[in-house]
Amino acid sequence: MSAKNSKDRTETFYARTGKRIFDLVLSIPSLIILSPVYLLSAILIKLDTPGPILFSQDRVGQNGKPFRLYKFRTMVKDAAKIGPPVTTADDPRITKTGRLLRKFKVDEMLQVMNIVKGDISVIGPRPEVKKYIDIFAEEYKDILKIKPGMTDYALIAFRNEEDILSRFQNVEEGYIKEVMPEKIKLYRQYLSEMSLRTDIKIFFQTIWEILVK
C-alpha cells in the first residue's frame, strides 16, 4: 500500500465523518438489542467464579492515544498477573463461562460501549496493547491514523487465534513472530480499501463467521 493511497483513504469524507455516523447508527440500537445478552452474561460470570464482571485493559487508539477497552471477564481474577496478555484455547486461566462467551465472541460485544464513546469504530484494525505496537512501531505509523475497530479482516482471518497459538511452545513469541506480521498485512489492506462498502462487507462477514459457520 502506497503512502499516497493510505493518505487518500484516511482523508476522505467517509473516513473523517461517515464512519462516525455509521458507528452510531449501528452501536446505539445494539446497546438496547444486546442488553438481555449483557444481563445474562453478567449473571453467569458472577455465578461461575469470584471476581469482577467486567475486564478492562489499556489499548492504543487513534494517533497513539491510550484508552480503556471493555470486555466481559472470561478468565480467573487477576489472570494478567499469572500469564501473558495473549491466550491459547487450552489456557487454564479461562473459566467455564468464559469459554462459552469466547466461542461466540460475546465477551467482545461489550465493546459497543467503546464505539459509542468514540474510542473505536465498528470496523477497523483491532486495538492492540502498547508493548506489541512498540515492537512494530514503524509498521503502525499508518495504521494508527484511524480509529481501531471492533472487527476487521484480521479478526475474521484469525477467528480461531487461540487454537493457532496453541501450536507454539512459547505463546507470546509465536504471537509476535507469526501472528502479528500477518495481522499487520490485513490492517494495511483495510487501510487501502476503507469505504462504506468495505465496512458493510466486513460487518456481514463477521456475523457470518460468528453466528452461522
Where are these regions (language model features)?
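A hydrophobic, helix-centered structural microdomain
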Residues: 4-79, 190-213
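C-terminal terminal-structure detector
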Residues: 7-9, 13-14, 145-213
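Residue-level "hotspot" positions that anchor or transmit function at local structural transition points
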Residues: 9, 31, 85-88, 144
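Positions in alpha-helical segments
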Residues: 27, 55, 95-99, 131, ...
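Short, hydrophobic secondary-structure boundary micro-motifs
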Residues: 41, 84, 123-125, 130-131, ...
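Short, glycine-rich, amphipathic interfacial segments at transmembrane boundaries or analogous
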Residues: 55-93, 154-181, 185
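A short, structured surface patch at a secondary-structure boundary
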Residues: 88-154, 201-203
